[in-house]
Amino acid sequence: MAIKGPRKHLKRLAAPANWQLPRKERTFTVRPSPGPHSMDKSLPLLLIVRDTLKCADNAREAKKIIQMGKILIDGVKRKEYKHPVGLMDVLSIPELNENYLVLFDENGRISLKKTEKTGVKLCKIVNKTVIKGGHIQLNLHDGRNQIVKVANALKAEEDIYKTGDSVLVSLPEQAVVGHVEFNEGKLAYITGGKHVGEFAKVVEVEKRTLYSDIVTLENKDGEKFKTIKPYVFIVGQDEPVISM
């Protein structure tokens, strides 16, 4: 029989391995709704509230907390318990005065780091296009599209944003307030591969045409390693521009 419409259920056995769910406790788990992050790079908000933060004992309590608007993602109340929460998202609980930054641990699993409220978020530019009117649209890693108004998109002095660069976005206004270029010597956060979750300096970038560029990096111990450019998230010069 043909599939008629989107899948609405997810068995624990079929859930991404990096969710680290007890596979045999129950049959089903929460399937994240389509949103800013892919399923294998995010966690549904309900699982974060119940399993990661331990703010609820069961799914019913977690749903009630979420539906009451007590959880903010990037400064916006999210009342959908299936909302996917992923890399660099800022999760806030105003009643507890707590803020968390979503990162990956050394095994590629979603982890939350307690942080201070900064009012900004770091986003990676994954693509950019020229839209009607000659302005530049930046496509960010979390599904956002930011429009940068320029007089002439063909002029290098105006087209300063490149794919792979990072931008600071204000929360909840969602305006670009900062820019970190992808250059040699910049500090990067690794989001995939066997070095996931590490910080390292960009040493060299090997350009390739048919495949992803190869980036050589050096970690704090002086060890050099290589990974592909999509796994490299620029976060600053010598220190991250946000608390990480």
From Swiss-Prot:
Start and end residues of each S4 RNA-binding domain: 43-106
Pfam families: KOW, Ribosomal_S4e, RS4NT, S4
Entry superkingdom: Archaea
Alphabetic keyword roster: Ribonucleoprotein, Ribosomal protein, RNA-binding, rRNA-binding
GO-annotated biological processes: translation
Molecular function per GO: rRNA binding; structural constituent of ribosome
Gene3D superfamilies: 2.30.30.30, 2.40.50.740, RNA-binding S4 domain (3.10.290.10)
Gene Ontology CC terms, in alphabetical order: cytosolic small ribosomal subunit
PANTHER family: 30S/40S RIBOSOMAL PROTEIN S4, SMALL RIBOSOMAL SUBUNIT PROTEIN ES4
Family: Belongs to the eukaryotic ribosomal protein eS4 family.
Name of the protein: Small ribosomal subunit protein eS4
